[in-house]
Regions:
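Strongly charged
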Residues: 1-109
Length: 109
């Protein structure tokens, strides 16, 4: 599995926009900070929809008074909290559902 970092995204943006890396990096940082800020300020839930990419959603979880620690088998209480969820767009879903043989000949621009 390949791991892509923010630096890789900055490179792609710089290449796509035909600008130097040091000019593209603040743009990527600003987008990431805007997404993170929106999620962290969610009261208590929010939904960030990015067309042709997907939806980030902050959801509330219920408290689990009888959860179990898998290592010790001890019964523990897990309080209600928020979590993030990502739902890919139809475009991404269709791409990911392609048979692997077809993907070998497909390159994303």
């Amino acid at each position: 599995m390949i791991t892509y970092t923010k630096r890789d995204i900055v490179r792609r943006v710089a290449e796509s926009m035909d600008v130097p890396l040091n000019q593209a990096e603040p743009w990527v940082d600003t987008i990431i900070e805007a997404l993170r800020g929106t999620i962290m300020e969610a009261d208590p839930t929010c939904r960030i929809e990015l067309r042709d990419f997907g939806v980030f959603e902050v959801k509330e979880t219920k408290a689990k008074p009888k959860a179990r620690n898998p290592k010790t088998n001890e019964v523990i209480y897990v309080p209600a909290h928020r979590k993030t969820h990502f739902k890919p767009s139809k475009l991404l879903k269709e791409f990911l559902r392609q048979p692997l043989e077809e993907l070998e000949n497909h390159k994303v621009d």
